[in-house]
């Protein structure tokens, strides 16, 4: 009854108006699962391949009809008849069928859509919430959200080199409280920016994209917004950034165009470290470029005992690359993006490896998103503890937050918000200093 009987795919649009793949998997029992695949703007060079048509006369070359055809052709032929409850078998079938290291023959967007839709169909067949199907009886941890409230870099047309400035409501008692604290800070920040004559348009992930003097001014605005919203910076709401340093790493230097600086990797480490002394900055993602492993080792040596250092572009959710990083002493946390690796099974393997090595895990969206909220269930199902899914506006971002509210309600008093554990893990109880 849980046997896959049909697979369907279609081309839909993501939050940037670009095509992406949506897949539906139907079972013999009549249960179905649907999943839509996100897309990134700043991407790691070793990510699994997102297949695009390349026809400039249609969606400016970004159509995904080839990926859709692959789902409804080769992939459907291979997985119809398989048991949806055997996720590993389904995903291994996809991997064998593709036969490449980077999913370049069938496309990671085609494969991931099928993989996630299969999991949804299986959870529906069993009558279980997706988070419980993914994680079992011990799925109970509500993640701390890393809320992107100021955008720069590749995500916004302004003079900020750092791609994301985020807030983390670590002092909340529940996820519901954390969401409220974040929303109140977001709206306070909007008012502060508007009062000073800054544009309050938003970037791809819903954060504001003002032209500011420098990065310190961005931090100061956020600190003021936290305080005027009635919260204590550091103790109740901490700060995080995604530098996305690969985007401005050129010829061995970190070119901070907005600040007129060209830094070596050691100077970049020092520059980032200075922010941690001035502000309650507890998490830095992609502080160095993906190819700069020497810089990453230095960053980890100098800051890894006190703050979270998240590897995104350097690891691309790949268990083999993460294993290298663990051996090399690089970072202490990994960003998990489903479409970087292309199947649910490989994603779960990466998360398990990270936990075994005492690396924290941050489940993440992409800048090109849909209304699909699979990552919310994944974050709770795997007790990941953190989720990065954008700002407090745009329905594609709020869909994930709202699903977490539903999950927390479903868990009732058995749910645990990760904020206090995040504080104790890195020792962030003290209020940060400006």
Swiss-Prot record:
Induction: Transcribed when grown on lactate, glycerol and glucose.
Lineage: Bacteria, Pseudomonadati, Thermodesulfobacteriota, Desulfovibrionia, Desulfovibrionales
Active site feature: 205, 337
pH-dependence of activity, as noted: Optimum pH is 7.8-8.1.
Required cofactor(s): Mg(2+)
Regions of compositional bias (Basic and acidic residues) in chain numbering: 47-56
Name used for this protein in its record: Enolase
Family: Belongs to the enolase family.
Role this protein plays: Catalyzes the reversible conversion of 2-phosphoglycerate (2-PG) into phosphoenolpyruvate (PEP). It is essential for the degradation of carbohydrates via glycolysis.
Entries under CDD domains matching the protein: enolase
Subunit and interaction comment: Homooctamer.
InterPro entries, alphabetized: Enolase, Enolase-like_C_sf, Enolase-like_N, Enolase_C, Enolase_CS, Enolase_N
One GO CC term, this protein: phosphopyruvate hydratase complex
Name of encoding gene: eno
Gene3D superfamilies listed in its UniProt record: Enolase-like C-terminal domain, Enolase-like, N-terminal domain
GO terms assigned for molecular function: magnesium ion binding; phosphopyruvate hydratase activity
Details of cofactor binding: Binds a second Mg(2+) ion via substrate during catalysis.
Residues that, per the record, bind Mg(2+): 242, 285, 312
Catalytic activity from the UniProt record: (2R)-2-phosphoglycerate = phosphoenolpyruvate + H2O
Disordered, as annotated region: 29-56
Amino-acid positions noted as binding (2R)-2-phosphoglycerate in the UniProt annotation, renumbered to this chain: 163, 337, 366-367, 388
Subcellular location: Cytoplasm; Secreted; Cell surface
Organism of this sequence: Nitratidesulfovibrio vulgaris (strain DSM 19637 / Miyazaki F)
